[in-house]
């Protein structure tokens, strides 16, 4: 598999199926952001896995993070596929699984009274 194509050298890229779009297209921006989140999850998982004590306590969360990473890759792939040129990988059960995880973890957080500023 080639990791570069040279199609993006002029500010354009190709979606699945060959459709050419600007690198500023909303689809491209969206799967770029998904890649960023996926990378951050990867760093978190790697840090936890390197620490035996943390890994024993948070190993199950690592598995969930890895599942979310796969879902992000699938969703990014779907975003790069215009007009359902193939069946989408992301399924409603994936969304339900993520919602269930959120419902499970949200009560463990302090009450949210305002938006959280990242950093």
Regions found by a protein language model. Give the residues of each.
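Phosphate/pyrophosphate-binding loop motifs in nucleotide- or prenyl diphosphate-using proteins
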Residues: 1-119
